[in-house]
Curated annotation (Swiss-Prot):
Biotin binds at Y67, Y78, W116, W132, W144. GO terms for molecular function: biotin binding. PROSITE patterns: AVIDIN_1, AVIDIN_2. Keywords: Biotin, Secreted, Signal. This is Streptavidin-V2. GO terms for cellular component: extracellular region. Homotetramer. The biological function of streptavidin is not known. Forms a strong non-covalent specific complex with biotin (one molecule of biotin per subunit of streptavidin). The keyword Signal applies. A motif (Cell attachment site) lies at residues 83-85. Residues 37-159 form the Avidin-like domain. Disulfide bonds: none annotated. Residues 1-24 form the signal peptide.
Length: 183
């Protein structure tokens, strides 16, 4: 009887040890979360004005891709580079990310750059919510107005022409602080 009890205790302890070691390895949860973020971020995204953001989220936390603006004087696609949190929180928070586009390509050099910073939010209606800064080269006297500020929400669903027109008419994201003063 004693041998049976000892064997039963040994089996129980082994089971507890295996269960504890499987759940005590947070790196497995983190790796799974990172893979979900990587797969979710990668793809084609559209903002409310119809600009197209094509991105690849790499396992090392880098972002690479192109950006095609639907507004301003930008022509064709521009290279983008950025970073994302490749070890995101596992508490349901968004995944922090950011990228930059220098508005120079084979067609045009606008002597400006835009940086977006925000969060990727996973789910059935995945989105990337961002704030952006657009800085243009200016003279020292005009440096005070060299940077515009705005926000974009990107989704994987291209907006309709009607919703783009409505956003433009509403003045969404023109980023010019002087427009608010002049109205």
């Amino acid at each position: 009887m004693r041998k049976i009890v000892v064997a039963a205790i040994a089996v129980s302890l082994t089971t507890v040890g295996i269960t504890a070691s499987a759940s005590a390895d947070p790196s497995k949860d983190s790796k799974a979360q990172a893979a979900v973020a990587e797969a979710g971020i990668t793809g084609t995204w559209y903002n409310q004005l119809g600009s197209t953001f094509i991105v690849t989220a790499n396992a090392d936390g880098s972002l690479t891709g192109t950006y095609e603006s639907a507004v301003g004087n930008a022509e064709s696609r521009y290279v983008l580079t950025g970073r994302y949190d490749s070890a995101p929180a596992t508490d349901g928070s968004g995944t922090a990310l950011g990228w930059t586009v220098a508005w120079k390509n084979n067609y045009r050099n606008a002597h400006s750059a835009t940086t977006w910073s925000g969060q990727y939010v996973a789910g059935s209606e995945a989105r990337i919510n961002t704030q952006w800064l657009l800085t243009s080269g200016t003279t020292a006297a005009n440096a005070w107005k060299s940077t515009l500020v705005g926000h974009d929400t990107f989704t994987k669903v291209k907006p309709s022409a009607a919703s783009i027109d409505a956003a433009k008419k509403a003045g969404v994201n023109n980023g010019n602080p002087l427009d608010a003063v002049q109205q």
